[in-house]
Amino acid sequence: MEDEKFINSGDKPTLLNISDLTRQNMYYRKEIWTGEYLQLTVMSIPVGGEIGLELHNENDQFIGVEYGVASVYFGATKQGVKFIGNVKRDYVIIVPAGTWHNIINEGNVPLKIYSVYAPPHHPKGTIHKTKFDSDLSDY
């Protein structure tokens, strides 16, 4: 399924090949599906890139790694963020609401991940071509 041809089905029941969608995604972030209580996005983090230290007070997050390797950082406070471990394909990262976190691409290929937010975090239809675009947004 080509990224540009995917049509967001909103809150309708949907069947997706998450591995293909994630690996084919070339954008820093793309919203794939948003329901009332849950949202799916895919991300491509460039070599040496990162999500950036962030905190979601209102959202739990489930992040799956489909391609690449990364280091993961967690903390109860911004100043208390520490290295937790490395992840690769088939690992998941679970981030409870209120946890500071960062994911850094440590590999020599783009890091391909998907993220499930509960409740939804990004506006429906969100596409950030680069991290810079994401940083300019208010969400």
Pin down the residues of each PLM region.
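Short beta-strand His + acidic residue motifs that chelate non-heme Fe in jelly-roll/DSBH
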Residues: 51-53, 72-73, 95, 101-108
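Conserved hydrophobic/aromatic beta-strand scaffold that supports enzyme active sites
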Residues: 31, 40-44, 62, 84, ...
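Glycine- and acidic-residue-biased ligand/ion/polar-headgroup-sensing regions
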Residues: 58-76
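A short hydrophobic beta-strand segment most commonly corresponding to one strand
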Residues: 62, 109-125
